[in-house]
Amino acid sequence: MDKRGRKELRSIRRAKRTKIEPEADAGVESSGSVLEAGPAVEEKVQDDGEKEDDKEQVYNALLTILKSEHKEDKVKTHRDHDEEESEAEEEEQAEDQYNDAFADGESDDEDDDEDEQAQEQEEIESDDEEKDPFDTHFNGEEAAKHGEALGNALKDNKLRYKSIKLKVGSADEDQVQEDAIFSVPYIEGETPKIEDPKLKCSLSSYFLKKRLRIQNNLLDTESNALTDLQRKIVDPMMQYKDILYEYDTYGKDEDEYRDLYTLHVLNHVYKTRDKIIKNNQKLQDNPDSEFLDQGFTRPKVLIIAPTRDSAYQIVTKLIEKSGLDQVDKKGKFRDQFYDPSFPPSSKPKSFQHIFKGNTNDYFVLGVKFTRKAIKLYSNFYQSDIIVCSPLGLQMIVENTDKKKRQDDFLSSVEVTIIDQFHSIEYQNYTHLFTIFDHLNKIPQEQHDADFSRIRMWYINDQAKFFRQTMIFTKYISPVANSLLNIKCRNLEGRWKNHKIVSSEDSSVGTVGLKVRQIFQRFNVLGNSVADEPDYRFKFFTSVVISNITKSTGYDDGTLIYIPEYSDYVRVRNYMKEKTSILFGDINEYSEQRSLTSNRTLFNQGRLKVLLYTERLHHFRRYELKGVKNVVFYKPPSDPEFYKEVVRYIGKTVFLGDADLNISTVRCCYSKLDGLALEKIVGTKRTGVLTHGQNETYEFK
């Protein structure tokens, strides 16, 4: 990896538009989902059994990249509020991480299987395997046959999905604020079998390990009370279905779903390990017995988070839920992941939440559980859980030095969680697709696995049909849907919620500014996602630009907000080459000098038009001055951004430099923008805007 490696990987490199097409897979619906799978931590993989050459390979990619010399411009790495760690600090951290990960002579209480079995055998035997989703999903014969059939159907392009809609909340349709869409895979030519999922809305039916019930005060059924959010997702989560969940508020909602999924993954890790211990004892009694209870490698859970601050909160919650007091390298973890800093109070609350603490987006952390301790910074192949950022893991699985490239440790991941997807999407989201390409592949090397105990669906390359994926996001986007539809194949099906947005709660309804808001629709022939950018550009240059040049209102103060960087480049080049408009442009890659000068010239009216990208707004949240008109080239991905940008006009009016009766907001959209429009104008209005006879709609 050269000096530019990390900088380039953080940069937006738009893949072909077809990559995020909701219908990119034949027969796959846009109702998202997620994939998971379950048991099997290889007890054979012990610290004292690891070979030194394996150790050298695991973090080698991470170490090499961190050591590479590079300079990162603050604008390009989007750290307005937080200083970059120095290169020397990164080198020192990489050295320490490497040394800790591969240190020899580590005492491992987990090796004491006999004591473990004696203490836990009663609990292990008490599990009802016939009813426990853990066993029916990962160890059931019916599930194995179904996975094999789906694997053949996928190869033959005959895999399809059938969906049903479930009401969530009030039985009164006028009061319903949320739907759930449940989709199951089936084979073309066969009659799809889909039934309403069993909703228990409680943890008491899901066989949590006794140690977790004790630690988290869940022994008493009455104390199992869940929040409204948790009641909605507990059943699909514990039944190992894929989940795409859109939540409402930062902080509170994130704490609630993390409380639930940390319990789930701990339960999964413990059951995986206990099953192996149980079968080990059976093999001692009867060596001729056969038990298929393992995968190729030990890591079973992958948690992807946007920043070190998010990772710190997640790992801290895992420690808290586990009840284990001994945590190796806890101080080091706090030093490298915790930061008490907070963004300025003048910034929006959402910005303060996303960018608080340590915003470094480059990390990979192995977490290992033993009977008495949690070991942080553990060797990947000895870890139960891997917590990472998309960039951090991508730099390992796609290392430019093929000798240092590693992805075998992802071969047996059974639960994948993407936390705060909306924030990750503003990084380079293509890293997520890359990571999913490396999940559940058959390893290139043997890593001390006992092949006599590896499940057949691992050997037959069908693990992706057993993996559970859970995605949590502030708002569902086409990219989130695409990731689920293309990369997630869980045989248990997909569960996705759909928030019903009233007109009063929409961005238009809560903007608090009585300004003309005009929505103009353009048509896309065949509703092709691949062709949509061309139709949008043609509409913008032929209709919107002419309105700007022939405006009967203000001849300056027009802000053009462009979500996609590739669209921004295209519009900028057109305005430079084909028009005589005096304009400036600022984007996430602009130097600070350019950012400052263009904003000043625009405020003074010396630049009539200013091009402004969504990623710059996400990472900076500028208070732009001098805005009299706003043009949205495309509806903002985040509905909060719509209100923030429109309110720029209000500030100009307050200063006496504009009149609300003259100022306008114009938004270009097509039928394919339904997801974004729904949050901006409301669910019912979106149906009218996308399918109504008129092509122009106005709100005030």
Swiss-Prot record:
One of its GO terms (molecular function) is U3 snoRNA binding. The keyword Protein transport does not apply. Residues 1-139 are annotated as: Disordered. It is found in: Nucleus, Nucleolus. Gene3D superfamilies: P-loop containing nucleotide triphosphate hydrolases. It comes from the Eukaryota. Keywords: Nucleus, Ribonucleoprotein, Ribosome biogenesis, rRNA processing. Residues 1-11, 41-57, 67-81 have a biased composition (Basic and acidic residues). GO terms for cellular component: nucleolus; small-subunit processome. One of its GO terms (biological process) is maturation of SSU-rRNA from tricistronic rRNA transcript (SSU-rRNA, 5.8S rRNA, LSU-rRNA). Coiled coil: none annotated. Residues 82-132 have a biased composition (Acidic residues). Pfam families: Utp25_C, UTP25_NTPase-like. Component of the ribosomal small subunit (SSU) processome composed of at least 40 protein subunits and snoRNA U3. DEAD-box RNA helicase-like protein required for pre-18S rRNA processing, specifically at sites A0, A1, and A2. Belongs to the UTP25 family. This is U3 small nucleolar RNA-associated protein 25. It comes from Candida glabrata (strain ATCC 2001 / BCRC 20586 / JCM 3761 / NBRC 0622 / NRRL Y-65 / CBS 138).
